[in-house]
């Protein structure tokens, strides 16, 4: 099984507002940059979108390590919030509807195909590739305005 690393980030100007996302895929030292923009979105949607688009770009099942600065996503996966949400018919422990259900469901489909591990990185820190993703995601907002 091919081993791929994906660095991701999402950004939003105002929340909600225009947003950008970036995913950097690395396989055998070769980097591929994916990026996108949405007119009216949220930061969390852009974080999810970056991961989904990164996984969507893989042409066969892979062993993937996703690096993200989103505690929201890392906790939802690694602490199995997402499993609890599904059991509770996509409701939080406070009985409120989970936000971004459409994207969580899409992500779950890719998690069935790929062996994915999520790692939290500190945002706006010394992680070069996370910082690059952040810059690209923010640049998408500026370019599209």
Curated annotation (Swiss-Prot):
<feature type="binding site">
    <location>
        <position position="9"/>
    </location>
    <ligand>
        <name>Mg(2+) 2</name>
    </ligand>
</feature>
<dbReference type="InterPro" id="IPR050092">
    <property type="entry name" value="RNase_H"/>
</dbReference>
<comment type="function">
    <text>Endonuclease that specifically degrades the RNA of RNA-DNA hybrids.</text>
</comment>
<dbReference type="Pfam" id="PF00075">
    <property type="entry name" value="RNase_H"/>
</dbReference>
<keyword id="KW-0540">Nuclease</keyword>
<keyword id="KW-0460">Magnesium</keyword>
<comment type="subunit">
    <text>Monomer.</text>
</comment>
<dbReference type="InterPro" id="IPR022892">
    <property type="entry name" value="RNaseHI"/>
</dbReference>
<feature type="domain" description="RNase H type-1">
    <location>
        <begin position="1"/>
        <end position="142"/>
    </location>
</feature>
<dbReference type="InterPro" id="IPR012337">
    <property type="entry name" value="RNaseH-like_sf"/>
</dbReference>
<feature type="binding site">
    <location>
        <position position="47"/>
    </location>
    <ligand>
        <name>Mg(2+) 1</name>
    </ligand>
</feature>
<keyword id="KW-0255">Endonuclease</keyword>
<feature type="binding site">
    <location>
        <position position="134"/>
    </location>
    <ligand>
        <name>Mg(2+) 2</name>
    </ligand>
</feature>
<protein>
    <recommendedName>
        <fullName>Ribonuclease H</fullName>
        <ecNumber>3.1.26.4</ecNumber>
    </recommendedName>
</protein>
<keyword id="KW-0479">Metal-binding</keyword>
<dbReference type="InterPro" id="IPR036397">
    <property type="entry name" value="RNaseH_sf"/>
</dbReference>
<dbReference type="GO" id="GO:0004523">
    <property type="term" value="F:RNA-DNA hybrid ribonuclease activity"/>
</dbReference>
<dbReference type="GO" id="GO:0000287">
    <property type="term" value="F:magnesium ion binding"/>
</dbReference>
<keyword id="KW-0378">Hydrolase</keyword>
<dbReference type="InterPro" id="IPR002156">
    <property type="entry name" value="RNaseH_domain"/>
</dbReference>
<dbReference type="GO" id="GO:0003676">
    <property type="term" value="F:nucleic acid binding"/>
</dbReference>
<comment type="similarity">
    <text>Belongs to the RNase H family.</text>
</comment>
<feature type="binding site">
    <location>
        <position position="69"/>
    </location>
    <ligand>
        <name>Mg(2+) 1</name>
    </ligand>
</feature>
<feature type="binding site">
    <location>
        <position position="9"/>
    </location>
    <ligand>
        <name>Mg(2+) 1</name>
    </ligand>
</feature>
<dbReference type="GO" id="GO:0005737">
    <property type="term" value="C:cytoplasm"/>
</dbReference>
<keyword id="KW-0963">Cytoplasm</keyword>
<dbReference type="GO" id="GO:0043137">
    <property type="term" value="P:DNA replication, removal of RNA primer"/>
</dbReference>
């Amino acid at each position: 099984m091919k081993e791929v690393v994906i660095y991701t980030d999402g950004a939003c100007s105002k929340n909600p507002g225009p947003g950008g996302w970036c995913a950097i895929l690395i396989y055998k030292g070769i980097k591929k940059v994916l990026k996108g923009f949405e007119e009216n979105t949220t930061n969390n949607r852009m974080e999810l979108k970056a991961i989904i688009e990164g996984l969507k770009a893989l042409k066969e099942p892979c062993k993937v390590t996703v690096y993200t600065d989103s505690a929201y996503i890392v906790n939802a996966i690694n602490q199995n919030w997402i499993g609890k949400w599904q059991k509770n018919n996509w409701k939080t422990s406070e009985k409120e509807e989970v936000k971004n259900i459409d994207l969580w469901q899409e992500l779950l489909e890719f998690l069935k195909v790929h062996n994915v591990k999520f790692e939290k990185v500190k945002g706006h820190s010394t992680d070069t590739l996370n910082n690059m993703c952040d810059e690209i995601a923010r640049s998408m907002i500026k370019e599209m305005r």
